[in-house]
């Protein structure tokens, strides 16, 4: 019976365990399309982006765990007490995270959370990161990671410099072996 429960029983809730942030220095970053004169900006820009994406990821994981605790198994399709307030809190905190780092923080802002969280792939050692910079005020960071069963998904972040700070101008997603990029929310 224990073997049956191990495979088909209730899954343990591991969404509460604390994750540590991945350092940009620990990631595999390809810079082959970046001229040498911009290489000194790689660590600054990639570290900025990865740090902010992980902040968003931790928020999503926290809200998801709290949402699961509100669920009532007897009424799985009903809005539970506290759920509306949780969504409001998520939206406010999400906006608070994005406002200082994005040119248009409300454009296509996230309206969902889940498990795994959107940027969990950053802690996967197989994730590839490409740093592309051809002008001093604009950089592109692309990530490639396995999603699901063998599907390789890509994210593309375009960052621009405003005064002395880098900000995310846009985010797109795509799939391996495709040249098309689709607009996406940060």
Model regions and ranges:
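Generic detector of low-complexity/intrinsically disordered segments
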Residues: 5-6, 21, 51
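Low-complexity, intrinsically disordered terminal/linker segments enriched in charged
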Residues: 132-156, 162, 170-186
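Secondary-structure junction/capping motif
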Residues: 2, 40-44, 176-184
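Core segments of small alpha/beta cavity-forming domains
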Residues: 24-110
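N-terminal intrinsically disordered, low-complexity tails
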Residues: 10-27
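Short acidic, low-complexity intrinsically disordered linear motifs used
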Residues: 1-11
């Amino acid at each position: 019976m224990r073997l049956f429960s191990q495979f088909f029983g209730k899954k343990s809730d591991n969404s509460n365990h604390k994750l540590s942030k991945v350092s940009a220095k620990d990631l595999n970053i390809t810079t082959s399309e970046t001229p040498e004169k911009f290489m000194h900006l790689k660590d600054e820009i990639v570290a900025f982006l990865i740090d902010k994406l992980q902040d968003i990821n931790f928020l999503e994981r926290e809200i998801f765990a709290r949402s699961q605790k509100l669920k009532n198994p007897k009424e799985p399709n009903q809005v539970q007490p506290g759920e509306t307030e949780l969504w409001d809190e998520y939206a406010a905190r999400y906006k608070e995270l994005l406002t200082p780092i994005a040119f248009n923080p409300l454009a296509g802002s996230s309206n969902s959370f889940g498990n795994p969280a959107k940027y969990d792939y950053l802690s996967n050692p197989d994730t590839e990161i490409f740093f592309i910079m051809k002008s001093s005020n604009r950089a592109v960071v692309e990530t490639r990671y396995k999603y699901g069963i063998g599907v390789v998904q890509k994210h593309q972040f375009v960052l621009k410099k405003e005064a002395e700070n880098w900000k995310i101008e846009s985010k797109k997603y795509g799939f391996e072996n495709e040249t098309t990029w689709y607009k996406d929310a940060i």
